[in-house]
Amino acid sequence: MFANARAKRRSRASSPTPARLGGYAPLRVEITEEQRQDINEAFKLFDSDKDNAIDYHELRAAMRALGFNAEKSEVLKILRDFDKTGKGYLQMEDFVRVMTEKIVERDPLEEIKRAFELFDDDETGKISLRNLRRVAKELNENIDDQELEAMIEEFDLDQDGEINEQEFIAIMMDEA
């Protein structure tokens, strides 16, 4: 799982795809093809009536699906700024612009810390064998305990049998 995450990060970093942003003056920003697909899939998933436009509730749900906990005021501002019809809808191209900008603005360290919290569901501040087992099961990964223990051992710098947040950050930043 950790090795896959590092490999995935490397492949993302090495294969950016340009995206155009901004209201009337497009900016050139780099996102990966996978990120672009995630944005498109989120839009299509939450465009419940398939009219190529999403309303407030659909926009908020799509943003959450992409990992953004948007407040009501932020969602309303996006609709005000990008709704060309004045009917409270966001077109797909504008959704792609907004989400691309938000993805580019993400703080990688905050994203890693959020990922750590997903592993550390018991809030101990560490990723245990039990935590890894649960995540592997949720991801439908068939990894036996011996392999999971080897993963912990490889990255457990303080040799306490678990991965703490700093060790996890080092793994994800490729410093381990």
UniProtKB/Swiss-Prot annotation:
Keyword GTP-binding annotated: no
Keyword Metal-binding applies: yes
Binding site for Ca(2+) 2: D156, D158, D160, E162, E167
Residues annotated for Ca(2+) 1 binding in this entry: D47, D49, D51, E58
Pfam families in the cross-refs: EF-hand_7
UniProt GO cellular component terms: cytosol; half bridge of mitotic spindle pole body; half bridge of spindle pole body; meiotic spindle pole body; mitotic spindle pole body; nucleus
Single GO molecular function: calcium ion binding
GO BP term, example: mitotic spindle pole body duplication
Alphabetized UniProt keyword annotations: Calcium, Cell cycle, Cell division, Metal-binding, Mitosis, Nucleus, Repeat
Cellular localisation: Nucleus
Entries under InterPro entries matching the protein: CALM/Myosin/TropC-like (IPR050230), EF-hand-dom_pair (IPR011992), EF_Hand_1_Ca_BS (IPR018247), EF_hand_dom (IPR002048)
Basic residues compositional bias, start-end: 1-12
Segments for region (Disordered): 1-21
Annotated SUPFAM superfamilies: EF-hand (SSF47473)
Description of how the protein assembles with itself and partners: Component of the spindle pole body (SPB), acting as the connector of microtubule arrays in the cytoplasm and the nucleoplasm, is involved in nuclear positioning before chromosome segregation, SPB separation, spindle formation, chromosome segregation, nuclear migration into the bud, nuclear reorientation after cytokinesis and nuclear fusion during conjugation. The SPB half-bridge, which is tightly associated with the cytoplasmic side of the nuclear envelope and the SPB, is playing a key role as the starting structure for and in the initiation of SPB duplication in G1.
Family statement drawn from the similarity comment of this UniProt entry: Belongs to the centrin family.
Protein name, per record: Cell division control protein 31
Gene: cdc31
